[in-house]
């Protein structure tokens, strides 16, 4: 929707976009290698030449197969997941530290069955009842036969950042889009 709104301004209607998706690490590597002008991603430590600007948040939820007995619930205490198998983000994912911290702060050592990089892979494995997962509350969830459970404790949100390389020249179109993103951010 962001690009569509950007194109509504007639001054921006001729600007073309190429979109790529991947893990935070891969996207930031591509940004540093000048494959991308900007990246929307999670924050990643030790990227000193990258400028991270928070632009929005996403609530974290637990997703379970509709075949899982937990699907009868609407919300869940993380302690109730002690005996579940987890489909988990890989160490390359920008979400991994946030989810690790969520479990660590609740003294839970998740029983990780699979580690994957993409949201769609996680949702697909949960859909076939291989395990449960903690994921951002994204529209893609609705394309699977899953039940979303609100997390009772603690409320954690993923912050999405716009990442650019510090002190790198940005063409006017990129500069204009970056300003548009910042002006339309809804960080809370």
Give the role of each language-model region:
Residues 42-50, 105, 119-147:
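A ligand-binding cleft/hinge motif common to bilobed small-molecule-binding domains
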Residues 31-40, 60, 108, 126-133:
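Alpha-to-beta junction loops
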Residues 51-61, 137, 144-159:
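Short beta-strand->loop
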Residues 47-86, 172:
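Flexible hinge/capping segments at coil-to-helix
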Residues 148-188:
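A late-sequence structural motif
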Residues 1-48, 115-116:
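Central regulatory/effector-binding core of bacterial HTH transcription factors
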Residues 23, 77, 117-118, 136:
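Short loop/turn segments at beta->alpha junctions
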Residues 1, 84-106, 170-178, 188:
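Secondary-structure junction motif
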């Amino acid at each position: 929707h962001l690009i569509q709104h950007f194109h509504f301004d007639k001054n921006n209607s001729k600007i073309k976009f190429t979109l790529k998706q991947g893990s935070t690490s891969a996207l930031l590597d591509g940004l540093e290698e000048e494959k991308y002008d900007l990246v929307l991603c999670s924050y990643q430590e030790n990227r000193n030449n990258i400028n991270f600007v928070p632009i929005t948040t996403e609530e974290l939820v637990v997703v379970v197969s509709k075949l899982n007995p937990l699907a009868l619930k609407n919300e869940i205490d993380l302690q109730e997941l002690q005996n579940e198998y987890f489909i988990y983000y890989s160490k390359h994912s920008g979400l991994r530290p946030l989810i690790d911290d969520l479990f660590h702060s609740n003294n839970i050592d998740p029983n990780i069955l699979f580690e994957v990089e993409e949201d769609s892979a996680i949702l697909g494995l949960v859909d076939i009842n291989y395990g449960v997962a903690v994921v951002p509350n994204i529209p893609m969830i609705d394309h699977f036969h899953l039940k979303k459970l609100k997390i009772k404790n603690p409320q954690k949100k993923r912050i999405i950042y716009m990442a650019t390389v510090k002190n790198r020249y940005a063409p006017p179109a990129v500069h204009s889009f970056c300003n548009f993103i910042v002006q339309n951010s809804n960080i809370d």
